[in-house]
Every structure is written in structure tokens, then in C-alpha cells.
């Protein structure tokens, strides 16, 4: 019934040469973060399936979560499959639910940690989809208690650090009992350091709560980390006079140094990991 058109009935053979991947160069402004132009990552799936697939895409960066915790987060996302949260930006709902769920277990991320593990959330500049706006919207939609994600409560941020340096044999989801003394010690140092800055009028009040917390936590983490490296190198000890009630567990930090280094290196890759020399010098006065 139909006859082939000669001009279109063509065959071609394509020969591919050798390509050396090591010699390729990235494009200008190319970055490792993924930003969906259409806000739909898996448009051919239902929004529920899309959230789960998006969660798998994002959670692979949280390398310190074990399989039980990942399974728990998937169940939390599955529990709200019938809830319409956003009309367009469906793919970022999953990581926000994960962040709020982890926060409900006592672990929060500073701005630098968010940039390190969820750069898409940190780099969102539109007012509608900014981090704090999305947190408020999702809290309201899911019936969570409304409130700011970043508050002057330092334990949750150091609990995330504890998650990252956990012993492989820890039992239970988000269990940091073995590292609880480290959380208490780092938190006490940060609270006292924050009060010192308040008394000296060194806190930048124009900055957001998240930015102030980020600066405090980053300063304490990098100072403790660098002192730890000197201790390991020289086989010595150090103490911090700000840790009055909970002394720093140096042995624990030495034992987990490899994991601690991996976590610190992830933070150092971010643009928000900026340490004030003045703050660091002030804090170092309390280390001997």
C-alpha cells in the first residue's frame, strides 16, 4: 500500500574515535548540583513516585545514614503520598520532609551542612522557594508544629556531627548514645563562646539566626579539628576551659578521626564555610 521514498531510505555507518575522559574540561559555570528547569524530575511518574525517586536521588549524599534510617525516611515520605504540598516544585518536597523528620529525631543541619549535602536547597534564591519559606509551608501542610528551623539550640547541630562519626556497631535509628558526651561538650563550648561574643558586642545582629549559628558552629568545629590533628601528630593532649561540665572526649575524637576528617572536608568544599580569624583567635585562647 505504501512505497518507500528513495531519498529517505538511507543507511549510514558512524565510526567513533577514542575519547579520553581525563582530557575533557568542564563548561564555564558548570556545577555538580542538579536543578530541574521544569521542576519535574520524573514527569512520567505520579507525584508520589516522583517524591520517592527524588528522595533516593538526594539521600545518597547523606553517606552517614544507615539502611534502617533511609528506610524510615522513605516510610515517612510514603505516609504523606496523598497530601498535595506544592503545585510545581514537587521534587524538593522529599528532601525537606527528610530534613524535618531528621530534626524531629534531634538532628539539624547548619547552613554549611545544607549546602554540602543539599546544594539545590541552599542555592534557591527565589523568595517563594527559599529554605525558610519552604520549611514553613511543609510544616503547615503536614501538621508539624510551626517554627523556625534554625534556633539558638546547638545540640541538634552537633548531633548531626555525631551521626557522621558514629561507630558502625551503633544500634537503633539516629542513635548517638555513644557520642552523646561529645555533643554535650561541643554544645557547652559553643554556648559559652556565644555568650563571650554577646558580652563583647561581637555578634553581627544584622545577620540571620541561621548565619550566626553557622558561624559559631563552624568556628568551634574547625578549631577542635585542627587542635585534634596537632594532638595526633605530637601524641599529646589538649583541654578547653569552656568545657566545664562536659570535658572534650579526646580519645573518642582520636578513634573517629578518619570519619571526622571526612565530614570536615565535606564542609570545607562549600562557599559558606568561612571562618572569622577574630572569632577563631578568640576561641583559641581557651584551648591549652
Curated annotation (Swiss-Prot):
Induction: Expressed in the early phase of the viral replicative cycle. Keywords: Activator, Early protein, Transcription, Transcription regulation. It comes from the Viruses. Pfam families: Pox_A8 (PF04745). Belongs to the orthopoxvirus OPG134 family. Heterodimer of a 45 kDa (A23R) and a 32 kDa (A8R) subunit to form the virus intermediate transcription factor (VITF)-3. Acts with RNA polymerase to initiate transcription from intermediate gene promoters. This is Intermediate transcription factor 3 small subunit.
Amino acid at each position: 500500500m505504501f512505497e518507500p521514498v528513495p531519498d529517505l531510505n538511507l543507511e549510514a555507518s558512524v565510526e567513533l574515535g577514542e575519547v579520553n575522559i581525563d582530557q575533557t574540561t568542564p563548561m564555564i559555570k558548570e556545577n555538580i548540583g542538579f536543578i530541574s528547569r521544569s521542576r519535574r524530575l520524573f514527569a512520567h511518574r505520579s507525584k508520589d513516585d516522583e517524591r520517592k525517586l527524588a528522595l533516593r536521588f538526594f539521600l545518597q549524599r547523606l553517606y552517614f545514614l544507615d539502611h534502617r534510617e533511609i528506610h524510615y525516611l522513605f516510610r515517612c515520605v510514603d505516609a504523606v503520598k496523598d497530601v498535595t504540598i506544592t503545585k510545581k516544585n514537587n521534587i524538593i518536597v522529599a528532601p525537606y520532609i527528610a530534613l524535618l523528620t531528621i530534626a524531629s529525631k534531634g538532628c539539624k543541619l547548619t547552613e554549611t551542612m545544607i549546602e554540602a549535602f543539599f546544594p539545590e536547597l541552599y542555592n534557591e534564591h527565589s523568595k517563594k522557594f527559599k529554605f525558610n519559606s519552604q520549611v514553613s509551608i511543609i510544616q503547615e501542610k503536614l501538621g508539624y508544629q510551626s517554627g523556625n528551623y534554625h534556633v539558638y539550640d546547638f545540640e541538634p547541630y552537633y548531633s548531626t556531627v555525631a551521626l557522621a562519626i558514629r561507630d558502625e556497631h551503633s544500634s537503633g535509628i539516629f542513635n548517638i548514645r555513644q557520642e552523646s558526651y561529645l555533643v554535650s561538650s561541643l554544645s557547652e563550648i559553643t554556648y559559652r563562646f556565644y555568650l563571650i561574643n554577646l558580652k563583647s558586642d561581637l555578634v553581627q545582629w544584622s545577620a540571620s539566626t541561621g548565619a550566626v549559628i553557622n558561624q559559631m558552629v563552624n568556628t568551634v568545629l574547625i578549631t577542635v579539628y585542627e587542635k585534634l590533628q596537632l594532638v595526633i601528630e605530637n601524641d599529646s593532649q589538649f583541654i578547653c576551659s569552656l568545657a566545664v561540665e562536659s570535658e572534650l572526649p579526646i580519645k573518642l575524637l582520636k578513634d573517629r578521626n578518619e570519619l571526622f576528617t571526612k565530614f570536615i572536608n565535606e564542609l570545607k568544599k562549600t562557599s559558606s564555610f568561612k571562618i572569622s580569624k577574630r572569632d577563631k583567635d578568640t576561641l583559641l585562647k581557651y584551648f591549652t
